[in-house]
Amino acid sequence: MFEKIIKGIKYRLDEDSLTAVVIRKKDYKGNIVIPENVVSKNLSYRVTRIGNSAFYRCWDLMSITIPKSVTHIGKYAFTYCKSLTTIRIPDSVTSIGKGAFSDCESLTSITIPESVTSIADHAFGWCTGLLNVVIPDSITSIGKYTFSNCKSLTTIRIPDSVKSIGNGAFFMCETLSNIIFNGTIEQWKNIEIEKKLNLGVPATTVHCSDGDVEL
């Protein structure tokens, strides 16, 4: 393996598998487009992962385009990208690491693809400008403090595929007044909820298909 910067993006290249991982570089900024393949020494490498902390504290990063070749987004990959307003996660991605988008305070909307089955701890914590989250029917678990301190979030839809929600998933989401749950009250009550999911929230109503539950 070796590391190389190609057209402004730093990669770790694996000559055996011919795959590439986007890795940490301090000065990513503006609008970044990650290609599906990169070439070095006449060999083509498939970009399959965004590594842990790859864009950590890149405060001037505004948007990122992730190719359909990427299957994994690492831990804290975009943490503290305070100017990041737009990101599209392709449906090739199957896992999103802990805290991957935490503290992205300018991010207003996020769509999680159906290829993902669980949302990791702290994944979108402290995204204080987040207004809209799309959680697909493929999701079975929501981690601890996943949306904590998303202070602009007023409503979120949770599919009936979800079987567990971690402690403090909506901690200090001060304006979260409505959770739209696609299942019944009985299905909601059967979800494994670790401690209190909305601590620090004045009042939240879960709207189920057959009635409401007050948290």
Question: Where on the chain are the PLM-derived regions?
Answer:
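Structural signature of tandem-repeat unit edges
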Residues: 6-10, 15-18, 26-49, 59-72, ...
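A structural signal for leucine-rich repeat
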Residues: 171, 191-196
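N-terminal low-complexity, Pro/Thr/Ser-rich intrinsically disordered segments
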Residues: 1-4
